[in-house]
Design a protein with these regions (language model features):
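Soluble accessory domains appended to multi-pass membrane transport proteins
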Residues: 1-90
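Solvent-exposed, non-transmembrane regulatory segments of membrane-associated proteins
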Residues: 49-50, 65-69, 79, 83, ...
Length: 153
């Protein structure tokens, strides 16, 4: 079910429900655009109701680091960023996963909890800016794909 005030996503568009009528639902996006959603869309499209099970949501940001990086330092920095961010919740506490030994990087995922799904894009962007800044301050490189070419004579 959808109620006024819910944050929903349908067909890739996210909005806060403002009004529900017999034929349409009106929602407003984070950039203040009005979505008019025909109610039949709920039957033919996948609907995500971000507030259906409460207001606590989980999000994540992934980042890769150079293979020469101290992985414990990466974990410490990522947790510090999450702990100090004003829009992230302290409980449940943020977590860092060492996801993979990637082709070009050691891959990590910062998982966090927030209570305003309407700000998710801004929160994730803000965290990425902070990761870039903190990694730069600590001389941690975010690698890019590289290839070694061996030439035979």
């Amino acid at each position: 079910t959808v109620h006024v005030g819910d944050i929903i996503e349908i067909d890739g568009k996210i909005g806060r429900v403002e009004n529900i009528k017999i034929r349409t639902t009106r929602a407003v996006t984070f950039d203040n655009k009005v979505l008019i959603i025909p109610n039949h869309k709920y039957l033919t499209s996948t609907l995500f109701n971000w507030t259906e099970n409460g207001t606590v949501l989980r999000g994540s940001v992934s980042v890769g680091v150079d293979y020469n990086t101290d992985v414990e330092k990466v974990k410490e920095i990522l947790l510090d960023i999450a702990d100090s961010h004003p829009h992230l919740m302290k409980n449940p506490s943020p977590n860092v996963l060492f996801k993979n030994f990637g082709d070009n990087s050691l891959d990590f995922q910062l998982i966090f909890t927030y209570n305003n799904g309407f700000r998710v894009n801004l929160i994730e962007s803000d965290i990425r800016f902070l990761i870039y800044q903190k990694f730069k301050e600590n001389n941690i490189n975010i690698p890019f794909p590289q290839r070694v070419v061996h030439l035979q004579k």
